[in-house]
């Protein structure tokens, strides 16, 4: 399924750029209508188990939309655009399907087929079912008991899974080595800079700064001498250095939390950083020529 989704995404990238440019809402619509529908095919049968490859496809798509670097962690990408893991939707579909099948007692063939699926191996059957219910804080017995009482559980289980994956994501952000600042700029809803119409390229620039792409100090996998400022060649290229210490930039009067805030108050300063880097690269290129 991941291969099919990647193929569709590859086709979408080309004409999506031509038709919609950087329009965030239209690209979200493309994902929902074309790519996600492919990834969710047959989820009623495999939705108990989280599919890491499919989650990776979704994160890759949103990195592309926001112009983020490939090393941006998936949990930061999902938090920035406020999208759930695909497992939430897949689990809901499986639970709803199970409830519909078990509610059709007159269809014996369908009932027997479903019993065999639940008893299957490889995470699609009983083990996957148990893991799913455990993840959302229920036992299989508790869910089955409530269903016998006529209570539909899919909405409650979907809500619980959404809360669980949100807690998991926030926990990963707290422990992040790549972007430890991000925890302090998390928003409860979609960041306001993404909600404003127009300036799509500006949104991508802000997203890169917020998600840690425009610093080198946080690239812990690089050598120390590779993490220096690209403008002045001095200290490690952190946001604090760029704001207060870099000789090639004017000292900014606001703090980094305001610069990275959801309203993008530091947008003009970000443009200055990007433009100054581009001018420096052009000078260095001319010098080499």
Regions from the language model: what does each represent?
Residues 93-204, 260, 273-276:
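Flexible, low-complexity interdomain linkers flanking nucleic-acid-processing modules
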Residues 16, 61, 87, 177, ...:
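N-terminal regions of proteins, emphasizing targeting and processing segments when present
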Residues 1-120, 128:
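Non-catalytic, peripheral interaction segments enriched in hydrophobic/basic residues
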Residues 23, 27, 49, 170, ...:
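Conserved aromatic-histidine-acidic binding/catalytic patches
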Residues 8, 55, 82, 162-164, ...:
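Intrinsic low-complexity/disordered segments
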Residues 19, 184-289:
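Family-specific functional microsites
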């Amino acid at each position: 399924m991941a291969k099919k989704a990647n193929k569709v995404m590859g086709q979408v990238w080309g004409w999506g750029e031509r038709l919609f440019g950087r329009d965030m809402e239209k690209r979200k619509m493309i994902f929902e209508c074309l790519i996600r529908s492919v990834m969710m095919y047959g989820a009623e049968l495999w939705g108990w188990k989280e599919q890491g490859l499919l989650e990776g496809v979704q994160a890759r798509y949103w990195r592309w939309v926001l112009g983020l670097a490939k090393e941006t962690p998936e949990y930061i990408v999902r938090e920035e655009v406020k999208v759930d893991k695909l497992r939430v939707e897949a689990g809901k579909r499986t639970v709803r399907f199970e409830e519909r099948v078990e509610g059709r007692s007159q269809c014996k063939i369908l009932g027997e087929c479903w019993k065999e699926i639940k008893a299957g191996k490889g995470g699609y059957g009983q083990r996957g079912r148990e893991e799913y219910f455990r993840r959302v804080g229920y036992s299989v017995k508790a869910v089955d008991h409530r269903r016998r009482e006529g209570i539909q559980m899919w909405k409650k289980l979907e809500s619980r899974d959404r809360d669980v994956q949100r807690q998991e994501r926030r926990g990963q952000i707290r422990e992040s080595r790549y972007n430890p600042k991000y925890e302090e700029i998390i928003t409860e809803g979609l960041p306001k800079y993404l909600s404003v119409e127009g300036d799509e390229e500006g949104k991508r620039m802000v997203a890169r700064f917020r998600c840690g792409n425009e610093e080198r100090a946080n690239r812990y996998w690089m050598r120390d001498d590779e993490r220096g400022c690209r403008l002045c060649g001095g200290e490690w290229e952190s946001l604090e250095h760029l704001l207060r210490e870099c000789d090639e930039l004017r000292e900014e009067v606001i703090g980094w939390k305001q610069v990275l805030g959801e309203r993008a108050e530091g947008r003009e300063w970000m443009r200055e950083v990007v433009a100054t880097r581009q001018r420096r690269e052009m000078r260095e290129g001319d010098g080499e020529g």
